[in-house]
């Protein structure tokens, strides 16, 4: 049985190192791996010993914490209906732009994100009790990247308006939704923190069964937003938008004269519980674990308008192409720009974990019972790699 357990754990550790595929699980034996310190000798006494003191029971560890999520499995968390203009039904020619909101099927409902990445570098500090329990925290910086179908971001615009673009009515609302395009965003590097606890619950020889609980939080701002759409392609650096505002947006939306906007930021929260099993083989302690986690990315459903000129140049305020090729720049003529997209905007919808359960495999290398380096990979609910290097005082 011991040989089988060793084989399984060693295979898992080697597999993780060869295929680096949020929050790490960590080695369940970590509280008891480093039993000696670089400044003070470790204490191997019995917690029930009446002569033992808290000074004997407590120790500190510090080190580096690196967590790199290459693909988090996320989906949108939105309502089934979305308020916008009625869907166009005119066979030919233009029509008056809609001015009333209609409940339509939300194209963002249940959408899966194509890519979600997050990279964190931090310092970690752990308070150890009786070489069995850890209470730890991390303080550092994180940055992220999100990519998805334009429908996931409710990219909409007005099409077929019979008015000249210079005189779009203030009450006009979008009537077209885009689902054949891509939206991606990059966040800045911002402060991130996490707290957690880990305990070695059961030990038998070289095997250790442990559990942990962690919580992490960060709020990065959106550094760059790219909309890759044939009908309305644009890029915004440090985008701003409207929070809690229904259509129609102000006619100044997307211009430098816009008011009532705020910076686009994403409020990231995640908590995780895990259970793992390890087996010590001299310097190496491979482990395998399962985890259950929930992550959310909330941008307050901020709506961001396409950038445009505050005043018309050649009777246009954007460089959106014509759809039917019938557009013409002609002052005062009705419908001449009816086949170009008007008042284009998108919103950053709330996202959450699409899968809650995952597995983690890794190994820890311990030197002189004072220093340790852990390498881990996580699969199923995310593809991620984790590196942790620490020493005990």
From Swiss-Prot:
Its main location: membrane. InterPro entries: Major_OMP_Chlamydia. It is found in: Cell outer membrane. The lineage of its organism: Bacteria, Pseudomonadati, Chlamydiota, Chlamydiia, Chlamydiales. This is Major outer membrane porin, serovar D. Induction: In infected human monocytes transcripts are present by day 1 post-infection and have disappeared by day 3. In patients with confirmed synovial Chlamydia infections, 0/8 had detectable transcripts. In infected human Hep-2 cells, transcripts are visible from 5-48 hours post-infection. Belongs to the chlamydial porin (CP) (TC 1.B.2) family. In elementary bodies (EBs, the infectious stage, which is able to survive outside the host cell) provides the structural integrity of the outer envelope through disulfide cross-links with the small cysteine-rich protein and the large cysteine-rich periplasmic protein. It has been described in publications as the Sarkosyl-insoluble COMC (Chlamydia outer membrane complex), and serves as the functional equivalent of peptidoglycan. GO terms for molecular function: porin activity; structural molecule activity. GO terms for cellular component: cell outer membrane; pore complex. GO terms for biological process: monoatomic ion transport; regulation of cell shape. Part of a disulfide cross-linked outer membrane complex (COMC) composed of the major outer membrane porin (MOMP), the small cysteine-rich protein (OmcA) and the large cysteine-rich periplasmic protein (OmcB). It comes from the Bacteria. Residues 1-22 form the signal peptide. It is a multi-pass membrane protein. Keywords: Cell outer membrane, Cell shape, Disulfide bond, Ion transport, Membrane, Porin, Signal, Transmembrane, Transmembrane beta strand, Transport.
